[in-house]
């Protein structure tokens, strides 16, 4: 289950606090990036940004040479980084680009080389950018 998330909370003169979140991971392969347009009356936002966690190693079974298969449990992946900013100044009508980082890939259980079992991928970056292009 993916738990990466980005959450905005907006407030400003005459604007009742609202929040919006994005949980589907973005990456260059699926080209799934988000945009958010600052509503009228909003002059500041709070953002909680969580990066994708690292992948874990898989459980593996192997023959240790004694004709008995050994099973080793997998290990959990690393946690994604988190940052929180309570007051980002924005301009009504401004567009923010958003990327929700993907979780890392798991280690390779199909390899006979034990070091590949733990060779899991790192998690993706999550970010917020003003205008410009994604990536």
Model-derived regions, located:
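Glycine-rich strand-loop-strand elements at beta-sheet edges
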Residues: 23, 28-35, 39, 49-132
């Amino acid at each position: 289950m993916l738990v990466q998330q980005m959450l905005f909370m907006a407030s400003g003169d005459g604007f009742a606090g609202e929040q919006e979140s994005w949980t589907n991971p973005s990456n260059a392969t699926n080209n799934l990036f988000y945009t958010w347009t600052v509503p009228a009356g909003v002059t500041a936002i709070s953002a909680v940004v969580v990066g994708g966690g690292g992948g874990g190693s898989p459980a593996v079974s192997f023959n240790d040479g004694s004709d008995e298969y050994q099973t080793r449990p997998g290990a959990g992946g690393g946690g994604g980084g988190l940052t929180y900013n309570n007051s980002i100044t924005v301009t009504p009508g401004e567009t923010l680009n958003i990327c929700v980082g993907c979780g890392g890939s798991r280690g390779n259980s199909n390899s006979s080389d034990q070091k590949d079992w733990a060779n899991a991928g790192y998690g993706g970056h999550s970010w917020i950018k003003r205008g410009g292009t994604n990536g």
